[in-house]
Swiss-Prot record:
<dbReference type="GO" id="GO:0003861">
    <property type="term" value="F:3-isopropylmalate dehydratase activity"/>
</dbReference>
<dbReference type="GO" id="GO:0046872">
    <property type="term" value="F:metal ion binding"/>
</dbReference>
<dbReference type="GO" id="GO:0051539">
    <property type="term" value="F:4 iron, 4 sulfur cluster binding"/>
</dbReference>
<dbReference type="InterPro" id="IPR018136">
    <property type="entry name" value="Aconitase_4Fe-4S_BS"/>
</dbReference>
<keyword id="KW-0432">Leucine biosynthesis</keyword>
<dbReference type="InterPro" id="IPR001030">
    <property type="entry name" value="Acoase/IPM_deHydtase_lsu_aba"/>
</dbReference>
<comment type="function">
    <text>Catalyzes the isomerization between 2-isopropylmalate and 3-isopropylmalate, via the formation of 2-isopropylmaleate.</text>
</comment>
<dbReference type="Pfam" id="PF00330">
    <property type="entry name" value="Aconitase"/>
</dbReference>
<keyword id="KW-0004">4Fe-4S</keyword>
<keyword id="KW-0408">Iron</keyword>
<keyword id="KW-0411">Iron-sulfur</keyword>
<comment type="pathway">
    <text>Amino-acid biosynthesis; L-leucine biosynthesis; L-leucine from 3-methyl-2-oxobutanoate: step 2/4.</text>
</comment>
<dbReference type="InterPro" id="IPR033941">
    <property type="entry name" value="IPMI_cat"/>
</dbReference>
<comment type="similarity">
    <text>Belongs to the aconitase/IPM isomerase family. LeuC type 1 subfamily.</text>
</comment>
<keyword id="KW-0456">Lyase</keyword>
<dbReference type="InterPro" id="IPR015931">
    <property type="entry name" value="Acnase/IPM_dHydase_lsu_aba_1/3"/>
</dbReference>
<dbReference type="GO" id="GO:0009098">
    <property type="term" value="P:L-leucine biosynthetic process"/>
</dbReference>
């Protein structure tokens, strides 16, 4: 078992007791909720006449179902409006902080908590959403949970969890131009597999991560779950502290200095013991594109769709399914694949730095004929900051639509959906069958910069060749 890692320290500090089942009852420092997985949890509390134990430790926003175009109330979708009203009622009744549409703080839950300074090193974080691992970028231990567990946290502020093993993933060296954090995590998942992290927490380390911004670290940690890991984290450092300083919920004054000293003490020890260690060279990572129906089916943009002979036997069945669904042939070059829709946004790549980098490539170009392209900021704050920098004008002049914040086309729970057999270039995190709203729609995952390259050429294109 691991010893001396940040994961072990944070786990031990939050252990209430070891249960007869062998699981640990873990105290949850920050609970994030949204409109999709919380209504049933609140209903279960009412059925049992239970109260929210620590409402000040729960924070809510609306993101999954919110339209990114017409946000007038009531929403056009009756189900979306009902979910919205339920969240408004539950947060008001239980005195829970709620970042509603128009508040200036609304957005995707995994974008707003960091930007408000709510997520901090050494915390345990839970949310009824798969990509809660995002918050591990701060040196927190963050878990995506189901609705019944949302109920448990509301009622007791604890979760019953089995302790994970810890795998250290080191990436060293400088990333090539045109290669981003999204490519790093897609490369890791490609190499370790979508089930490679089952039973593990991933500790991301090495010089590549040391040089990453907080928003880049969030992109990597966000997709830990796509590699099977329950959570992923980066040890806190000066980059973390510079990001957090002066944010609304960050410690202030003398408390700030004390917080840094404590956060530093949580870092994994130099002689920490890990259950597994894997290393990668940043120079080996290229702009990466998924070709199949899992995030692990990725290749460098200059590669071809792999043939069955190139795969392990246990990968061949899902590959055969992917060839058929994606309408791609083994050995076919991924470059040149026609694209219908381009989406920049999501909790993976909807932050300000993502939009800044994408805008660099969009400037001076125009979306290709027949391509629908749109940009969805991850939060109202991101949208405001981007507009202050003129990024919205760069995108609209290039033929992109500029939308309101929300989860948008990452998932099919709002009006932003693929139609029929369309194929999308998407900066989101999942390329499952039907994920973007059409039973036959197809998704290629890539970085925001690569999405721009696809948008302006109408096909999968190596962003490094874009003038």
């Amino acid at each position: 078992m691991s010893k001396g890692t940040l994961f072990d320290k944070v786990w031990d500090l939050h252990t209430v007791k070891v249960l007869p089942s062998g699981q640990t009852q873990l105290f949850i420092g920050l609970h994030l909720i949204h409109e999709v997985t919380s209504p049933q949890a609140f209903a279960m509390l009412r059925d049992r006449n239970l109260q929210v134990m620590y409402p000040e430790r729960t924070v809510a926003t609306v993101d999954h179902i919110v339209p990114t175009e017409n946000q007038a109330r009531p929403f056009a979708d009756p189900l979306a409006e009902a979910m919205m009203q339920e969240l408004e009622k539950n947060t008001a009744t239980n005195k829970i902080r709620f970042y509603n549409v128009g508040s200036g703080g609304q957005g995707i839950v995994h974008v707003i908590a960091p930007e408000q300074g709510l997520t901090q090193p050494g915390m345990t974080v839970a949310c009824g959403d798969s990509h809660t691992s995002t918050h591990g970028a701060f040196g927190a231990i963050a878990f995506g949970i189901g609705t019944s567990q949302v109920r448990d946290v509301l009622a007791s502020q604890t979760l019953a969890l089995a302790k994970l093993k810890v795998r250290k993933i080191e990436v060293n060296g400088d990333l090539q131009p045109g290669v981003y954090a999204k490519d790093v995590i897609l490369h890791i998942i490609r190499k370790l597999g979508v089930k490679g992290g089952v039973g593990y927490a991933y500790e991301y380390a090495g010089t590549t991560f040391e040089k990453m911004s907080m928003e880049e670290r969030m992109t990597v940690c966000n997709m830990s779950i796509e590699g099977g890991a329950r959570c992923g984290y980066v040890n806190p450092d000066s980059v973390t502290y510079d990001y957090l300083k002066d944010r609304p919920f960050a410690p202030k004054g003398e408390a700030w200095e004390k917080a840094i000293a404590w956060w530093d003490s949580l870092r994994s020890e130099a002689d920490a013991e890990y259950d597994d260690v894997v290393t990668f060279d940043a120079a080996d990572i290229a702009p990466t594109v998924t070709w199949g129906i899992t995030p692990g089916q990725g290749i460098g943009v200059d590669e071809s769709v792999p043939t069955p002979e190139m795969m392990a036997e246990d990968e061949q069945a899902i590959a055969a399914e992917a060839y058929k669904y994606m309408q791609l042939q083994p050995g076919q070059a991924i470059q040149g694949t026609k694209i219908d829709v381009c989406f920049i946004g999501s909790c993976t790549n909807g932050r300000l730095s993502d939009l800044q980098e994408a805008a660099k490539y969009a400037k001076g170009h125009h979306v290709a004929p027949g391509v629908k392209a749109f940009v969805v900021p991850g939060s109202e704050q991101v949208k405001q900051q981007a507009e202050a920098e003129g990024l919205d004008r760069i995108f609209t002049e290039a033929g992109f639509e500029w939308r309101e914040p929300g989860c948008s086309m990452c998932l099919a729970m709002n009006p932003d959906k693929l139609e029929g057999n369309q194929i999308s270039a998407s900066s989101s995190n999942r390329n499952f069958k039907g994920r973007q709203g059409s039973a036959t729609g197809r998704t290629l995952l890539m970085s925001p910069a690569m999405v721009v390259a696809a948008a302006v050429t109408g096909q999968v294109t190596d962003v490094r060749t874009l003038n």
